[in-house]
Amino acid sequence: MGKIILTGDRPTGKLHLGHYIGSLQRRVQLQNAGDFDRMFVFMADVQALTDNADNPEKIRQNITEVALDYLSAGLDPQKCTLYIQSMIPELAELTTYLMNLISVSRVQRNPTVKTEIKMRNFEANIPLGFFCYPVSQAADITAFKATTVPAGEDQEPMLEVTRELVRRFNQTYAPVLVEPEILLPEIACCRRLPGTDGKEKMSKSLGNCIYMSDDEKTVWKKVKKMSNGEPRMSMEEPGHLEGNAVFTYLEAFSTPEYFAEFWPEFKTLDELKEQYVKGGIGDGTCKKFLNSVINKMLDPIRARRHEFEQDIPEVFNILKKGSEDAREFAAQTMDEVRKAMRIDYFSDAAYIEEQAAKFKI
């Protein structure tokens, strides 16, 4: 088995710049580099339903939005497999088997689960499906024998659960499943891009997102409201980088080429920072530059999205074909899993003969 990438997103809303810089941009780069044998990218609708069970229409509508975001960002169905999680029933079966290999207390210790439970106010009444989603996520990964999972650093505890389950399964039954490694964003600030308020992770529920599909006017409206950290009385005062969302975003998105085009007074972000902390550069000017950078980056993405929006049936054809291909792969893994667990009753001819001989008079 070769090198395989697997990654995905919950279809609970349009994808934003945090998704793009945190993993989506890297996925496109990895796809185009061709260093991996297979690449799977999926919409985790089953996982999304664990905390949206009473609102399936929300998930249904956002399948289309996320698919458009994937395709507009540059994911190519000729190079990677795009699929919908619920269309692969083998994942539910594997989840059940993996649940037998982990304790409730181990899941409870997962810091990501603790954070998610608190964020959703589930402390007093946790849906079982939500509580068990680390195991479901492990099934998502292992069913496709993924060797690499591009993700943010907040997902490392989840990957560790997967690795533990792989080791436990392979030791208990047979060496069938593969231990995955996480692939973090190369730029540290991209691993957890803050919201426009500078205080929290970018999140739709917090209203601090810039979406990949936002038009130019909407982007500028949001950039103008971004946090600059500690306030200044005038631009002549020294600027502060700590807690300054504008510079965090510039760290993530600016390049020397953008400086040459939009702010030739500076060649690099380091030069701008050096002058900013001395004073003499207004926050409004920095925001205008950031606005130009973001919109320049989003222009081709928005253009591709518009093209795909004109043929939504084809978008669903892509997802249907990808789901069929993904299911075929997962089914092969499950054949190996059942054989390892000795529950391949109908395909094990030797077992049937043995049982026949046992009861033969």
Where do the model's predicted regions map?
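Conserved nucleotide- and phosphate/pyrophosphate-binding catalytic cores
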Residues: R163-I361
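Structured ligand/cofactor/substrate-binding pocket environments in proteins
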Residues: L15-L24, M39-F40, D45, D54-I59, ...
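Extreme N-terminus of proteins, especially the signal/transit-peptide cleavage junction
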Residues: M1-K3, F346-S347
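A short secondary-structure junction signal
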Residues: R109-N110, A146, A174, S205
